[in-house]
Amino acid sequence: MIGSLKFNFILFLLISTMHMFWCHPISSSKVPGKSDYFVILLNSCPTRMDRRVGLDFLKPILEKTLMKRSFRNGVGTGMKKTSFRRAKS
């Protein structure tokens, strides 16, 4: 269980920091004569990075995990009735 928590934490950090590595081209000194690629890559990058842009593919998964549970007598409350509450009502 601890191993899966570590894996989930590392995966979360990787995904949350991924936006920092987007649109950072290799400097032109490392690639001599390839300055055109440098300019094209800079022009294709958005000027303002939004944190949610990179995480759009996770939206359906997050919505499923955050969805409230509903029950017969407590629709939308997200609370599960215990046997004591059932016997009482």
UniProtKB/Swiss-Prot annotation:
Modulates arousal and anxiety. May play an important anorexigenic role. Binds to its receptor NPSR1 with nanomolar affinity to increase intracellular calcium concentrations. Keywords: Cleavage on pair of basic residues, Neuropeptide, Secreted, Signal. It is found in: Secreted. The keyword Secreted applies. It comes from the Eukaryota. GO terms for cellular component: extracellular region. InterPro entries: Neuropeptide_S. Residues 24-67 form a propeptide. The gene is NPS. Residues 1-23 form the signal peptide. Its main location: secreted. It comes from Bos taurus (Bovine). The keyword Signal applies. One of its GO terms (biological process) is neuropeptide signaling pathway. This is Neuropeptide S.
